[in-house]
A protein has these predicted regions:
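Double-stranded beta-helix
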Residues: 8-73, 93
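Non-heme Fe(II)/2-oxoglutarate
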Residues: 68-164
């Protein structure tokens, strides 16, 4: 869920989402063998030109499926584009990668908004690609994405055609 803290129009780089892309299956988010949290538009057959801008006034809420191909367009204005992002998941959707930075099950449970703590993670027959090996320069998701040479959102831009 995103909440715009500023008015967001097509000039100051709105969140862009490709409708229906969450139904295409797992997309590789690796660059040169390492997880980077972004996809290469040249290697990924996706209708990037179909990305829809999510514009709105400050206070607008945006929602999209976590597997939807999404990203922010370049901010081509002098206006800021602050966005508060909040993720929600089921109480039984444990991090398969384990807890990080010394976190424990108690820390995980403290985040429960609705539901009950469980020691039985839900495992469904869905494709999952683990984020291994970790990025060479592990940092924020935005830092990790910088290792990908071909990025549609934020570099190649929604107004530029991706060519193979």
């Amino acid at each position: 869920m995103g909440v715009y803290l500023e008015d967001v129009d097509e000039d100051n780089g709105p969140m862009m989402v490709i409708p229906g892309s969450h139904k295409t299956g797992v997309i590789d988010h690796h660059s040169e063998g390492y997880f980077c949290g972004a996809i290469d538009p040249i290697k990924t057959p996706m209708a990037f030109s179909q990305a829809v801008p999510l514009t709105g006034a400050a206070g607008t809420i945006t929602l999209h499926h976590v597997r939807s191909v999404h990203g922010s367009a370049l901010n081509r204005s002098a206006k800021p584009r602050r966005l508060l992002l909040q993720g929600y998941f089921s109480a039984d959707a444990w991090p398969l990668n384990g807890f990080r930075n010394g976190q424990s099950i108690d820390d995980f449970d403290a985040l429960i908004v609705r539901g009950v703590s469980t020691l039985e993670p839900r495992l469904a027959n869905i494709p999952v690609k683990m984020p291994f090996p970790k990025a060479l320069h592990q940092g924020s998701i935005y830092e990790n994405q910088q290792t990908l040479k071909n990025r549609y959102f934020g570099s190649m831009g929604p107004n530029k055609r991706v060519t193979k």
